[in-house]
Amino acid sequence: MAHKKGTGSTRNGRDSNAQRLGVKRYGGEVVRAGNIIIRQRGTKVHPGNNVGRGSDDTLFATIDGIVTFERKGKSRKKVSVYPA
């Protein structure tokens, strides 16, 4: 008869790293070309003037300027960058 307990196994103990999504530059902030404005999954916010969209839906500035959040119709949001 065993005089030590067998060690049990657990089905827990895993967790994924946070994705660090969200707005990185807010309205009125000055950005340089290439700065990331929003990291997102899907097009929660659409690219407007002078804003590009990466393959993972990241929005980034294509020119130096000031970030502006706008509406595109009733429900769509967009972000644009205008020269300072």
Curated annotation (Swiss-Prot):
Domain of life: Bacteria
Cellular component terms (Gene Ontology): cytosolic large ribosomal subunit
Biased composition (Polar residues): 7-19
InterPro entries (alphabetical): Ribosomal_bL27, Ribosomal_bL27_CS
Region feature Disordered, mapped onto this chain: 1-23
Keywords: Ribonucleoprotein, Ribosomal protein
SUPFAM superfamilies for this protein: Ribosomal L27 protein-like
Range of residues in the leader sequence: none
GO aspect biological process, one term: translation
GO molecular function ontology, one term from the record: structural constituent of ribosome
Family annotation (Pfam families): Ribosomal_L27
UniProt family annotation: Belongs to the bacterial ribosomal protein bL27 family.
Protein known as: Large ribosomal subunit protein bL27
Organism: Acaryochloris marina (strain MBIC 11017)
